[in-house]
Design a protein with these regions (language model features):
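Non-catalytic C-terminal accessory region of glycerolipid acyltransferases
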Residues: 33-151
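Catalytic core of membrane glycerolipid acyltransferases/transacylases, capturing the structured
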Residues: 1-28
């Protein structure tokens, strides 16, 4: 899933149309439809990728608050969440990357162990969010202690 504005970016449009579920973030109805489509894809055995912040955080590498939707969906479908830490995307992709191309370089990615949701219910969303947040944050804190020392 990703913001519908990416359909306007020539470089991403073709890839995005085939691989993503566009979401108009200004429309609650559109967000609901996107999560329904994501749920249908999960039912078909298709893996989906969701960024739980719902946006690129402007104080990267600090992380923003996670939204409930991805966790609610994972619990509803009883599928594991595989947290992924993108260590340096914020250096390669500028905030306005939809207007210009990013910087050359190698994206550093850490794929964490899956976090199961079997047996969890909606009452477990906050704990699940905290567990995923901690998994993603740990390598960021290690790599960029100057950003996380004030926490």
């Amino acid at each position: 899933m990703g913001k519908a504005e990416l359909l306007k970016v020539p470089l991403f449009r073709r890839f995005f149309q085939r691989m993503n579920i566009p979401v108009n973030r200004k429309s609650n109805m559109d967000s609901h439809r996107a999560f329904k489509r994501a749920g249908n894809d999960i039912d078909k055995g298709i893996s989906i990728a969701l960024f739980p912040e719902g946006t690129i955080h402007h104080n990267a590498p600090l992380m923003g608050r996670f939204k409930n939707g991805p966790f609610r969906l994972a619990i509803e479908k009883q599928v594991p969440i595989v947290p992924i830490t993108f260590l340096n995307n914020w250096l390669l992709l500028p905030d306005d990357f939809h207007k210009r191309i990013g910087h050359p370089g190698i994206a550093r990615v850490i794929i964490h162990d899956p976090i199961p949701t079997k047996g969890l219910s909606e009452g477990d969303i906050e704990k699940l969010k905290a567990d995923v947040y901690a998994a993603i944050k740990k390598p960021l804190r290690k790599k960029f202690p100057e950003y996380y020392s004030k926490e």
